[in-house]
């Protein structure tokens, strides 16, 4: 398919979401002709409408299309060189990963898309074949989409961005918390398993760097900034340094975590399973990544936000 040029036309699907709006901004900032797909039936969701209008005022093109209307999807993807999908894969919101199978069909029919980046942006599902129920559904569904992409011979890049900083750092790696306490923290296990934390704006910036890079064609791009590979204890230590105070610490054993998880509803259990694999098993750091697949090595011009810098906003 060859490499793309800097004027590649980009379609973002899910562009009003938590990561999607950052992808739209990164695409515009990079100078791409940017298209944002939205459903025809927005209703009275005023915040979504205002966000779409703000994209338009910044130079983006709004494209009306629906997963329930195959022809509209084909028409939408026919406008661009690159399709980035950021629809939700989070069960506590709306788990929509398999909707992308309709998108794969549309891209295959259109025949013009030079790169497709499906909704991934977390743990690499190809490495989670032994994941626990019920959380493994996220990885299983993403692998179904991957197989469909590859069987359709659609050029792709998968982005594994690990832990969103807003969710993990904001709560000091504690599930169900997105603001750091100044008094107490619960350490998962001994708090020494390392995770990888990435500012969502950096995820978007690295993603847009990758879309026209021949080095990332038909590969997985891992975003693992070296300074952000830290244990929960290290994250807490940085926060304590910022506030000039030691937190009271409680340890939560693996057994107690799993017992508490079983008392939650299905959607909560899915998310907690992911915390379990990251914070008790170290699933993000138990393998090596080739330098030509790691974003901060490929794109040293992107100045990523460190954990220390990120946590300062909460002081």
From Swiss-Prot:
The set of disulfide-linked cysteines is none
What does it catalyze?
Answer: (+)-lariciresinol + NADP(+) = (+)-pinoresinol + NADPH + H(+); (-)-secoisolariciresinol + NADP(+) = (+)-lariciresinol + NADPH + H(+)
Query: Which keywords label this protein?
Result: NADP, Oxidoreductase
EC number(s) recorded for this UniProt protein: 1.23.1.2, 1.23.1.1
Q: Which domain of life is it from?
A: Eukaryota
Q: Which residues form the active site?
A: 142 (proton acceptor)
Q: Where does substrate bind?
A: 274
Does this UniProt record's set of keywords contain NADP?
yes
Pfam families named among the record's database cross-references: NmrA
The free-text function statement in the UniProt record for this protein reads: Reductase involved in lignan (-)-hinokinin biosynthesis. Catalyzes the enantioselective conversion of (+)-pinoresinol into (+)-lariciresinol and of (+)-lariciresinol into (-)-secoisolariciresinol. Abstracts the 4R-hydride from the NADPH cofactor during catalysis. Has also a low phenylcoumaran benzylic ether reductase activity.
Instruction: Fetch the PANTHER family from UniProt.
Output: NMRA-LIKE DOMAIN-CONTAINING PROTEIN, PINORESINOL REDUCTASE-RELATED
The similarity comment for this entry is: Belongs to the NmrA-type oxidoreductase family. Isoflavone reductase subfamily.
Q: What else is known?
A: Knock-down mutants of PLR_Lc1 show unequivocally that (-)-hinokinin is synthesized via the (-)-secoisolariciresinol/(-)-matairesinol pathway and not via the piperitol/sesamin pathway.
**Name assigned to this protein:** Bifunctional pinoresinol-lariciresinol reductase
- In which organism is this protein found? Linum corymbulosum (Linum)
């Amino acid at each position: 398919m060859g490499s793309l040029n800097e004027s590649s036309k980009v379609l973002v699907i899910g562009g009003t979401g938590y990561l999607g709006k950052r992808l739209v901004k990164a695409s515009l900032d990079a100078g791409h002709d940017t298209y944002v797909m939205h459903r025809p039936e927005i209703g009275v969701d005023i915040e979504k409408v205002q966000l779409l209008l703000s994209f338009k005022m910044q130079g983006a093109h709004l494209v009306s299309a629906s997963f329930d209307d195959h022809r509209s999807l084909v028409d939408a993807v026919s406008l661009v060189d690159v399709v980035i999908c950021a629809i939700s894969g989070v069960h506590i919101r709306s788990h929509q990963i398999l909707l992308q199978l309709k998108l794969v069909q549309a891209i295959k029919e259109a025949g013009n898309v030079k790169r497709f980046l499906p909704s991934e942006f977390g743990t690499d599902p190809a490495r989670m074949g032994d994941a626990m129920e019920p959380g493994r559904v996220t990885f299983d569904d993403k692998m179904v989409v991957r197989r469909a992409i590859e069987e359709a011979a659609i050029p792709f890049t998968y982005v594994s961005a690990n832990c969103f900083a807003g969710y993990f750092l904001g709560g000091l790696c504690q599930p169900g918390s997105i603001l750091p306490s100044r008094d107490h923290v619960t350490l998962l296990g001994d708090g020494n398993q390392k995770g990888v934390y990435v500012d969502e704006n950096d995820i978007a910036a690295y993603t847009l760097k990758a879309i026209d890079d021949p080095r990332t064609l038909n590969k997985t791009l891992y975003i693992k900034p070296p300074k952000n590979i830290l244990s929960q204890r290290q994250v807490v230590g940085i926060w304590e340094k910022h506030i000039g105070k030691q937190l009271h610490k409680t340890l939560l054993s693996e057994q107690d975590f799993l017992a508490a998880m079983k008392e939650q509803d299905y959607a909560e259990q899915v998310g907690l399973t992911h915390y379990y694999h990251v914070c008790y098993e170290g699933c993000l750091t138990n393998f090596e990544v080739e330098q030509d697949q790691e974003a901060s090595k490929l794109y040293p011009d992107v100045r990523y936000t460190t954990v220390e810098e990120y946590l300062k906003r909460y002081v």
